[in-house]
Amino acid sequence: MTITRPKLFSIPSGTAFLPAFAKALLEGRLIEGFPGDASDPLALANATIYVPTRRAARALRSILVDMNPAKSAILPTIRPLGDVDEDAAFFNAATSGVFDLNPPIGKAERLLLLARLIRPWRESLPAHVRALFGVDDVSVPATTSDAIWLARDLAGLMDQVETDNAKWSELASIAPDDLADWWQVTLGFLDIVTKLWPEILEERKLSNPAAHRNELIWGEVRRLRDHPPQGPVIAAGSTGSIPATAELVSVIARLPQGAVVLPGLDRDLDEGAWNLLGASDDNPSTFGHPQYGLHKLLQAIGVLREDVEHIEDMSVNKRVLERVVSQALRPAETTDAWSELIDDPNMQPQALLQSAQKIDLIETANEREEALAVALALRDAISDENKTAALVTADRNLARRVVGELARFGIDADDSGGRHLRDIETATLMRLMVETVFNPGDPVALLALVKHPMLRLGGKRIERRLAAETLELVAFRGGTGRASIIDLPAFFDRRMEESASQSWQ
């Protein structure tokens, strides 16, 4: 492969990433001479674009079609990073190594096999390790469900270690001396992963999912490096958080027709603070910084921050906000630089107020009010049919509440986090039925079951709803006693008699 100068771009964090990327691509700002005539339906056909997720791939396809003057085109190949097409190996001699990979083990099979190894673990502890517990018995795992719970965590740890290309052998030396004895308990437990589990995988001719994904990505790296494709190859939106992905991005940046578009590289952080991000992996203020991953990626590619071209299409106010966020998130060791902002005209109170005039703070009394406030803001934002709105939150409970509040307004929100099977209506009905049977007398579960929208009881919905409200008011509010499904009619009659005999003032 001919070594070329890496081509890297960045789209500011205050700009919608995919629309800005699509616009730059169609305008020919990423790959010289590509796509040529953007109105040609075949102009994009021979390009390959890697994006972080399947959702991003679907969104980019829609955006490219919308931006095409003819509203139709043969789209480029758009792949999620880490989701390498194994079937393509059948038609490409350069990826013959893919045939030698063992297929990944299924999630359920892995959990059950790990649980079977964990279940007898406490019986295999050496005497000197058991002595650490004193008179207490080693009670973990106590049940099969405990073993499955531990298996789930152990599987997650395996995926994390293999994703980061870490070595299990390094675990033995990381504990301080005063914890070394207790650390042996942990190491003994991890023998399940380091000694027993590889034997099971070898016996079954299977591999761990993370290791299998890494091997596929490394195969793609070798293919691109040894046999560069004829068309453009672009990686968009990746931070290279996975070592294998970082290497793939690095190779793409050096392809003759390759380019990498980064999301929100900080161009305002001073050199001292920027270099601090790569000085140590042990400082929480550095590896927890939002730019830490991008700093490592640029190091892996072998370029400086100044070599990255910024695709800028921002208003003055958004540019000021970008600087404010950069200053607010600078590493703690460099916050003394804030004193220098006093002479910066863009950082004066009036300028900051003007740039933040569209930012609102809403304080609510509880989670329901919070979700309702967000839903109202989203509803107001999309009242203009030419606008879109999004809620970005790591709080899944808040997201579900907002989706529910929007449904009251007849708005079907697209929740990218999806829904657990246990949370769909049919599953909640089944869960409530089981709970009322195995936990008789719980009025909350019983009322939730009676009020469930999928519970019909052979009548009309409005009639069932009125009956449920009557049951709640007469039988459960202000009274005592516990009722199960079996004795609910007798319990209701008794509560009616008690209510009739009370003297009302």
Protein language model features and the residues they cover:
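Polyanion-engaging groove/track-forming segments
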Residues: 1-505
